[in-house]
Amino acid sequence: MKVSLFITCLVDMFQSNVGKATVELLERLGCEVDFPEGQICCGQPAYNSGYVKDSKKAMRRMIETFESAEYVVSPSGSCAFMFKEYPHLFRDEPAWAEKAQRLADKTYELTDFIVNVLKIEDVGATLEKKATYHTSCHMTRLLGVTDAPMKLLRHVKGLEFTPLPRKHDCCGFGGTFSVKMSQISEQMVDEKVACVEETAADVLIGADCGCLMNIGGRIGRKNKPIEVMHIAEVLNSR
């Protein structure tokens, strides 16, 4: 099975280890992974900031870049959801809307792809840690991926799991929200960190790098001994 990796800006610029873990994991599960070099930002930050015309330039580039892909997989629910939004955003441009729909139909968030396309729940991972899991807003509320991450984490050998209190509360990142509404964002992430501390977990796991950077940054500034890991890194652990 051929998979084209949609790496996302945050992984590309700040968390290349997540990209590496994603590729290694998919290859170990029998996928042939390629990285289309024409990919850029999906356009979400620009679109959410009101720069619709500029964001559509990026969207068209991404549609063309992944046009020949069999499957498109991303280690980010937020960015994968943006691809799913393309058909709606191009609804007044029929030719582009058709191309956008084809892209949307073959795009998956990583855990969703593993569980619902590859039909695998036990990837053979081992991690001797006490962990809790942060549920990201875009991945669950918009993309609709709710069960796949936990189905995979339940099979990680040695992982002691503790539910996160108020797990559906936003961490305060929200892309440009954390910049535009910084004081509110800071309060929200403080509350999220307090919930993480309440679990007494060694590691916080999540599936969106934006959330993990936001929460992890706050954990670091508070000098808390809590490790932050993307779910791709956990599933690739041996």
Curated annotation (Swiss-Prot):
It comes from the Bacteria. One of its GO terms (cellular component) is cytosol. InterPro entries: Cys_rich_dom (IPR004017), LutA (IPR022822). GO terms for molecular function: oxidoreductase activity. GO terms for biological process: lactate metabolic process. Belongs to the LutA/YkgE family. HAMAP family: LutA (MF_02105). Is involved in L-lactate degradation and allows cells to grow with lactate as the sole carbon source. This is Lactate utilization protein A. It comes from Bacillus licheniformis (strain ATCC 14580 / DSM 13 / JCM 2505 / CCUG 7422 / NBRC 12200 / NCIMB 9375 / NCTC 10341 / NRRL NRS-1264 / Gibson 46).
